[in-house]
UniProtKB/Swiss-Prot annotation:
This is Leucine-rich repeat and fibronectin type-III domain-containing protein 4. The gene is Lrfn4. Residues 17-518 are extracellular. It is found in: Membrane. Forms heteromeric complexes with LRFN1 and LRFN2. Can form heteromeric complexes with LRFN3 and LRFN5. Unable to form homophilic interactions across cell junctions. Interacts with DLG1, DLG2, DLG3 and DLG4.
Amino acid sequence: MAPPLLLLLLASGAAACPLPCVCQNLSESLSTLCAHRGLLFVPPNVDRRTVELRLADNFIQALGPPDFRNMTGLVDLTLSRNAITRIGARSFGDLESLRSLHLDGNRLVELGSSSLRGPVNLQHLILSGNQLGRIAPGAFDDFLDSLEDLDVSYNNLRQVPWAGIGSMPALHTLNLDHNLIDALPPGVFAQLSQLSRLDLTSNRLATLAPDPLFSRGRDAEASPSPLVLSFSGNPLHCNCELLWLRRLARPDDLETCASPPTLAGRYFWAVPEGEFSCEPPLIARHTQRLWVLEGQRATLRCRALGDPVPTMHWVGPDDRLVGNSSRAWAFPNGTLEIGVTGAGDAGAYTCIATNPAGEATARVELRVLALPHGGNTSAEGGRPGPSDIAASARTAAEGEGTLESEPAVQVTEVTATSGLVSWGPGRPADPVWMFQIQYNSSEDETLIYRIVPASSQHFLLKHLVPGADYDLCLLALSPAAGPSDLTATRLLGCAHFSTLPATPLCHALQAHVLGGTLTVAVGGVLVAALLVFTVALLVRGRGAGNGRLPLKLSHVQSQTNGGTSPMPKSHPPRSPPPRPQRSCSLDLGDTGGCYGYARRLGGAWARRSHSVHGGLLGAGCRGMGGSAERLEESVV
């Protein structure tokens, strides 16, 4: 008989193992093997003393903190090839002894900053074969000092936590292959002195920045920790930026060039160093001069060519680099936008295009035309300064001397919604950049501006309010006297006009439409009446003909007293009495003439129906009446 203590231990051990799993108690370690068991979640009754837990090849969809709570002795956790789409925050929070975590072959799309919190002694992290598109910058912070192997291959990553990866001094193997990575930060691997394998295969890398890490693989015997580097399957752009890599002379790799076209498809290490060349930047087109009104958006464009693609910068009039701000935006393609221009934005801007082969510059002139502001006058030269429309009208009313020599402003050809503004040529001694028309109406006090080229002497105002009074002033914008002055504004004249009231254009059209409608209606009534009358006559004639059907008599023989009487002689049939002559007979007699008359009647009716609308407007109506009478006489 077994001792009671041994039976108790066996019973407790059997109860601790989940039913679908296999538990192995090898020496002091306990392994729980639950692979290929069809599990939908982590078994809740797993022994908390488990050292190795294998849950691979199941259908687990999510992980949460209760799944591994109090499993402080767990060293190896395998969750490969499940259907995990979500890892809750601090799901591994109690796994302080965990050394190996396998999450490959799942459906993870994102790793948050707290998804992997807890395993501070983690050494091997396998995340390959998921659908990861983003890994939070702080996702690896708990095991930066201990991690030795990191595998994030076969995902959809464009970026990885480079700052965290660059701070892993114990990292030996880094697999980044088969992702969408298109750039490596310069010097990102400088601190990885223990790195022995770096796999960058099948990404989107067109170039690689120089890094001391790559030179360790050139001489494996001299390097304390030789590097196995693989970056084949990338669209390498073989120009001067990769000349440093070409000089490493690694004959064991099979990389090829994807561009430029002259080197596409050639073996990378077989291309002579002299063919790894670059082209200096060349400004292809740019804005030369731009004039905008104060407050408008200004767009300065600059396009450059070169190999590699030049980096674009802008320098403002104050010789400072123009960066993105709340008012200005510098785009990578060389476009500079200023949202709301002011007088201080005017000046010369410099577009700078740079690449490793050199730089190119272009000058762009921005002129900001200041709008008139109320209360500002210029005493120099006797010219009025910037002024709004109220001040301009007041100045015109006071009769300043400057207006007497200026041409008058006239508004002619005024309609309900438009008016033609005309003015004469200005004084030849005064250069004019452009004219500015200011106007507002009694219906809306909003001041409206219109800019007219200096070569014009008239302007058509459109979209005016019907029946409204307008005040209009014309100003000339001229160059300032000094480089630091604002644009000079000179008043040419003012005018007052009123638009015509809105005229209902539908009266004449209404009479015309009503006349046409009445004609069509009367014609329709007459046509309908003629149709009804004709059908009635045809029906009446057919009924009369059926009543006069001739009776056909057969010969009758009579037999009396059983005797037979001789057959009477046959007499020739008597001809029917003559009938009165008619134009047409509708009985069942001779119908040949009726058919001809019907054809004539149908043709006349077709001709008359085609000309009914014309007959309604003239003698046709009278002709139609006469035809109807003749038709009645011929049928009845």
